[in-house]
Amino acid sequence: MVNQAFDFKQFRKLQRVGDVFLPNCNIDVIKTKLIEVEKLIQNNIDNYEFTSIKTTKKNDKLIYLLDKNADNFIYDEFILRKINHNIKRIYKVKQADRNIIVNQIYNILKENPNYYIYRLDINSFYEAINRNKIVNKIFSSSVISVETKKLLQKVFERIQETEGLPRGLSISATLSELYMKDFDYSIVTTDGVFYYSRFVDDIIIFSIKELTFDYLNKTLQENTSLKFNNKKTKIIKMESNKQETFEYLGYQYVINKNSTKLKKDNINVNIAPKKINKIKTKIILSLLDYNKNKNFELLKNRFLFLTCTYPIKTSHQKISSYKNSGYLQGGLFYNYHSLSKDNASLKKLDEFVRNILFSNNIYSQALRLSDKKELAKYSFAVAYNRKFTRNYNAKRFEINNITRCWKYA
């Protein structure tokens, strides 16, 4: 039985290690806020407003987020977490694990190559979802609590700029998974399909039988209000003695076939070109920002941040057990742990860094030769192979300051 109460005890269960990193927050402040928000919900739920929700734009899409400096931020954040928790637990919604998917695809590619691969992308995923279908499902449920329904309705009242789901808010990922269940089931049970994965709007299908795009499109439209992005659709017929390339979840798979059974060395897994370009953009932005502020220590920290893997801890916690303690984790090896041993994409990044540092250009002209040599020591390939980890304590190390100039990268 799921306890759906919006009270202090349930809120505390949803606390994360990173919460103490939030502006003007510590354990005592969060505790006080959670006691306050429990009283607000109990005494006046009908008049509650999500006042910290704001919007920004990225790649011409409207992004919803919570203003961390708003007075009601902690209230809104934990209420949204609890709404999300209740719906996930009751409907058994679980988002796919990217790392598991990547490993599964690699293992499939090593097997007999006689099959079809379908790479599909859904156009304007969150914005095009029929919100009313989800609302009707949840609001007609006798299992979802009245408080959860009321507070979810309050969220939708706050985001009237979009008819779909609010891109950026945590509940949208859960609601979209609930919305896509029928489509997922239809594809999984299609004759010939032996592997299907969808990570948000990115889809990959392996089938021993040919599936027409018309069939896939019809199945999507019968179960949802969505459409495929035709420009990103790729259908591959795997055949012997033929090289194929496709991208999925930030990786690029290059398959070189020379027999009916692929060898491990015939499959190269690299960072996808778009992701490589994104890293290159961050390097350039870091150098341009240095040209303005002349803060070499900050520039070094940015190069370090890009090349290393990092668990993030608070000042009162031990780092040694972060994997089992809900610690935040990020960085190069964590994001791309399934690359091929030759690290071709990482070597290209190292080459890019050397070229931009030691050639005549506007990006590195303000650096001294000794500084350039020091920056060149930060190697993507070496850090990846050694699984180099840097421990960050957010109270003494300004991660936000490091990433500030990459905001629109």
Model feature map: region roles:
Residues 1-46, 73-81, 85-96, 103-108, ...:
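Right-hand nucleic-acid polymerase module
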Residues 31-55, 138-148:
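An acidic intrinsically disordered interaction segment
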Residues 49-59, 147-159, 323-326:
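Active-site-adjacent bridging/hinge elements
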Residues 52-55, 92-98:
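Short N-terminal amphipathic alpha-helices
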Residues 58-92, 161-188:
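Conserved pre-motif C helix in the palm subdomain of viral-like polymerases
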Residues 64-68, 119-120, 161-169, 200, ...:
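Glycine- and acidic
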Residues 99, 109-200, 204-219, 224-231, ...:
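Conserved polymerase palm-domain catalytic core
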